Amino acid sequence: MRMTIKRTVVIPDLQCPYEDAQLVKNLAAFIKSFRPDAVLTIGDEIDLPQISRWHENQPGWYEQTLAADRDRTVDVLWELTQHVREAHMVRSNHCDRLYNVIMKKIPAFMSLPELKLEKFLKLDELGIKYWKEPMPIAKGWVAIHGDLGALNPNPGMSALNQSKRMGVSVIMGHTHRAGRSAVSEAYNGSVRRVLHGVEVGHAMNVKAAKYVSSPNWQQAFAIVTEHNKNVQVDLIYVEKDGTFLVYGKRYGRAR
């Protein structure tokens, strides 16, 4: 039987323009060197605070920065995906803000193709496939953003709860926490099934996220390796200086 291996790098929440610029550079350099088969961004690639319901009728609602934030997001996505054959993105609550505000305020604008998220973020030009439903990232695993379910403050448990609800192992973002957990289903001394939940952290500049003061967040990303029927998910934690270790080799330039 022919042995095949597929490696996918999973990028956590970026929320441009609040992304950690040095970490983005380090991740892009790692992807260029590591040469995975695919890159997946797990959602919230852009923050879109200007059209958030929290900013409605507040000064932020009138800021003329949307175009600059969009262009920055497109540049970041290009940096992270230019060296792979496949690039993917899953739907998320922050990216949904564009659709939500149009539907609430000016629903007729939904007929304009340039306001669809795929066009707005130039995903077609970048070669990024957009998944509105859970993405089957590997055998027995799906990737979701993670905003459509109850959250647990313990890293990995929100993802595990999603996996138990969906009946498959789950890798997700949204919580900005990095961790994993698992549950086994056994009967009469035999393990029938093991479900995993993995949360991939974040890649934000926490100082720029002024809406939190002492968040329980961790910077990280993940590597999903599929080898025929076997799947290995490695959670890679980022050091305080923005560097990280992958399979015994250190990557990135320190801040």
Task: Give residue spans per PLM region.
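Mobile, glycine- and charge-enriched loop segments
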Residues: M1-A21, A138-K139, H176
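Conserved beta-sheet core of the metallophosphoesterase superfamily
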Residues: G140-I236
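A short C-terminal boundary segment appended to hydrolase-like catalytic domains
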Residues: T225-R255
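Hydrophobic/aromatic beta-strand patches that form the interior of the parallel beta-sheet core
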Residues: V9, L40, H88-V90, S169-I171, ...
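Short His-Asn-centered micro-motif
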Residues: I11-P12, I42, V90-S92, E133, ...
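Core catalytic region of metal-dependent phosphoesterases/phosphodiesterases
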Residues: I11-D124
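Short acidic low-complexity segments
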Residues: F120-G140
